Amino acid sequence: MRQLSPRGVTEAISCNRRDFLGVVTGATAAISLFALSSGKSLGSPRKSKRKAVVVTFGGGCRDEETFMPEGQENIPHLLKELIPQSTFFTRVINRGILGHYVATASLATGVYETFDNFAAVPPDHPTVFEYFRRDLKRPLDDAWVVAPANGFNRIGGSNSRLFGPNYAANVILPKRLLKKALSSTSGARYEHLLVDNYETPLLAPEVRGNRIDLHLFSHLMKLSVSDFVAHALTLSSPDELSVYIARQLMRRYAPSLLWITLHDMDVAHSGSYSLYIEGIQRTDRLCAEVWQEIQRQPEYAGNTTLIILPDFGRDSDLDAGGNGFQHHRTGDALSRT
């Protein structure tokens, strides 16, 4: 397969974000990503062979640390392994609210959501999970979300009267599961995996919605709590924990729709540029590992669409009203791209 040069990368196929979301979410999602082979009804209760895995990354990153020449060393897997096999959209702009939960919810609905980013509320508009489950009559175990923080616990389903909880996805909060599994004396060893978010609000949202608790998770995954905790100790970041959970889901249930939100690079809010770069590099590696897992699993290999996209960017170093890479508050071009 032809490898793209850096110049080729920047000249790859481009389209508007909302046009793209119109294809992969909303009323077209079930047909465009999960249409059954010819001769089978879309209303069939049997699982489709077509699958989709969506990886979004929050915290945002800028072109200068990624696709610009000086940043390309941070994303070798995206540039050399994934983009040559894919359609690459060079222009992705978020014109909505620059908060991680509300922005990710907007990706899941295809509509710019306007709720308070730190509120414990579901999206106002139907999500891709609800369209998928209702229109294709998919069971609950065929749509899952692996979310990075407690604030994402309501993302699996919307407030829509015609959709809602009956068609929502299962939501797993890996850090919350790990925290529940730990004793008060062992928590310090896992502190690096338990940071819920890097923009701590005054009031943390209540964990509600269609989320999975620790003992149900252990039962569903056929994985003991002790084994889960022991494996977590071998990991270096919360995103590695999320990808580990995603692998277990793929091997155990092979869901047709799996959504993973990564969040390590949002450590930029701490003001550490080196940790921000490390988060970008780790996200690049984990995206490649997800693709490799797809190729290894017979249920996924050859019939899976992998979609990788950011929620937004980060502030420019030149904007007097911002803090550069540290935040995403100005609404300037870099923070929205």
Summary of predicted features, one role per range:
Residues 14, 34-59:
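C-terminal segment of N-terminal export signals and the immediately downstream linker at the start
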Residues 114-121, 162-196:
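Acidic, His- and aromatic-enriched active-site or binding-groove loops in soluble protein domains
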Residues 69, 158, 220-230, 243-289, ...:
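Active-site His/acidic residue clusters
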Residues 53-54, 282-326:
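Metal-dependent active-site segment of extracytoplasmic phospho-/sulfohydrolases and closely related
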Residues 16-34:
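N-terminal export leaders
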Residues 65-102, 142-144:
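Short, structured active-site-proximal loop/turn typified by the sulfatase FGly-forming signature C/S-X-P-X-R
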Residues 1-16:
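N-terminal secretory signal peptides
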Residues 102-109, 323-337:
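Substrate-binding rim/cap in mid-to-C-terminal beta-strand-loop elements of soluble/periplasmic
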